[in-house]
């Protein structure tokens, strides 16, 4: 601003001040500098807001104007819009205003219908969402249940286990997830299944699995010796496992087998002890248990213990000799000691002879009562622990006394208590003289439990305790929880399963170890299917052949829906490992099927292949499912899936290694084979498949620039009309096409119109002088092309299928350009 402007402004200010001072009625307002600054800022911001709005309007006009939009027209339209009339409140009407009443009722009905529909839609959406969450939660629960290997509190025990290594940590080289012990077991399972599948005599699975113990330590070897001993029982044929396991005869046989194992183990222990201390043992005399026990006592009891009674035999306490001969399972040797000391033992010789000669090592009720009475009167507080122990075993009395001075090891305690177990309920025995197998099982599993046996340091000891008391399921479930011992637990379960000794859970959702209503209190059930699936999960993706061998054990098992578990596991295995050709076989070029691993297990592979194909289809793996259905000779499903696969890629440009190229080659291979072999599917599906192949050929020619050949193909297909007379016919025929064809109609119409437009431009670019055709022929061709373009427009408008607005616009645009 120049000097004159400032001078003029100063003059106006002085004049204004003079006029203000001249008015004496008005009070003077004095402002300080801060107030003046604030007032100036307010004025400035007001001016800037107006300026910025104008600037924004200018920028908007420039931006939208560059795109061909009229900003003033848009502003007017926006200002004219009003949301007030969308849902205006209903106005009160007079009683005689019929028109107003009807209008309000109509509006009310519309609003009510809209509100009801809204509520119903939201309710349905909420219900679907809730159901979806419930289904998803059920799946998550199943995964959690499959992860938790134990039951009860043990499943939530996250304490660090410092267990020793029982198997080699070094696995075989390569891609296998199996270590050397697991691979050795898998090899034995393969041998076993081969015999079964080929119809040979069923081999002894215990012996096969026990041979693996040679690769491992002594604990594993002893375990399999025990399993072999305990499973060597005579079962009633054609009887389920629960009836067999609950029968008195079988339970008595289990006790006899357990005692035999414990006695043989102790005899082996005495042999090792004696031969390890030959100088101290002074072994000699006639070979046999008696001399072995004498030598063993030279080591165990080098000096006489105070309190021992009834003298000695050859320098050793009588009752110690009798006890250890019985502990080694040799009653004849014990009888030899009794005969030598019969004068000191009173009636015991008679009682022992009856005990030794009885079938079940049981005295007659009269003799038993007599012995028990003698024990209560004279021996309960006797100072000779061996004498008390022998009387408690023969008379099965005073079961509450653990005889800890003699039975100081767990195996000794087991042997003593199993000798006292009784099965007959004569009603005459007092509670302190009666111990049933069920009571003993409950005592070991529930009263003592894992904490009593220090399972982290001695897992095999607790397994032995449970197994020798016929609690097979609890023993297997316990061992399975130990990561390093899991493979042994699984194969023990397989042995029990094959021998019909395993009690299985009735449902797959049950915990690994469970008790079902109606079962005896002492019995537990093992979820065998889950056990096997948890074990194979480790290696099924890397070793599908081995996993298949284990799944074969489930061939007679059903899930809750009645589906065969072998089929289900195989289908999941194939989908997981993607080893379709190796497991299910492969289709050769001539249409014959190359057998897969599954052929070893069944002669009729179609149900299995169809099942796997169905699972693949449900998972959206249509290409794999089509190949599997082709393998199973299910032509209808093959072409149905191929139609779904081909439909999206029909209009695409073919390129090497592309999805379309792969699917096209696959479809052509199927088509050639089906035609050569005369294979046909459902007529509707069949015609759709071959029409899609023709459309692929059409688009390949079109994209390659061979428009005349492409036009010949579309003309022969008669998919779209090319003259007005055939429009009605093509529209009627369109209703019979499948969705796979209809979805490609827009692209077919555009490609056909492009061909007509290209031919039209080519015709227009031909001058009469350079053309060999007469002018009349060119004009006729010109008219024909325009007519064909109009026919396509008419057809696009008449078909009962909604094409995109962009398609219609492009069709009309090209048709207009031709006119």
Swiss-Prot record:
Q: How does it sit in the membrane?
A: Peripheral membrane protein
Q: Name one GO molecular function term.
A: structural constituent of nuclear pore
Cross-referenced InterPro entries? Nucleoporin_int_Nup93/Nic96
Phosphothreonine is found on 49
Gene Ontology, cellular component aspect: centrosome; cytosol; membrane; nuclear envelope; nuclear membrane; nuclear periphery; nuclear pore
Tell where it localizes. Answer: Nucleus membrane; Nucleus, Nuclear pore complex; Nucleus envelope
Under the heading Pfam families, the entry gives: Nic96 (PF04097)
Its GO biological process terms? nuclear envelope organization; nuclear pore complex assembly; nucleocytoplasmic transport; poly(A)+ mRNA export from nucleus; positive regulation of SMAD protein signal transduction; protein import into nucleus
Q: Which residues cross the membrane?
A: none
Briefly, what is this protein's role? Plays a role in the nuclear pore complex (NPC) assembly and/or maintenance. May anchor nucleoporins, but not NUP153 and TPR, to the NPC. During renal development, regulates podocyte migration and proliferation through SMAD4 signaling.
For this chain, the family text in UniProt reads: Belongs to the nucleoporin interacting component (NIC) family.
Q: How does it assemble?
A: Part of the nuclear pore complex (NPC). Component of the p62 complex, a complex composed of NUP62 and NUP54. Forms a complex with NUP35, NUP155, NUP205 and lamin B; the interaction with NUP35 is direct. Does not interact with TPR. Interacts with SMAD4 and IPO7; translocates SMAD4 to the nucleus through the NPC upon BMP7 stimulation resulting in activation of SMAD4 signaling. (Microbial infection) Interacts with SARS-CoV translation inhibitor nsp1; this interaction may disrupt nuclear pore function.
Sorted alphabetically, which PANTHER family does this protein's record hold? Answer: NUCLEAR PORE COMPLEX PROTEIN NUP93, NUCLEAR PORE COMPLEX PROTEIN NUP93 NUCLEOPORIN NUP93 DEAD EYE PROTEIN
Supply the name of the protein.
Answer: Nuclear pore complex protein Nup93
State the taxonomy lineage.
Answer: Eukaryota, Metazoa, Chordata, Craniata, Vertebrata
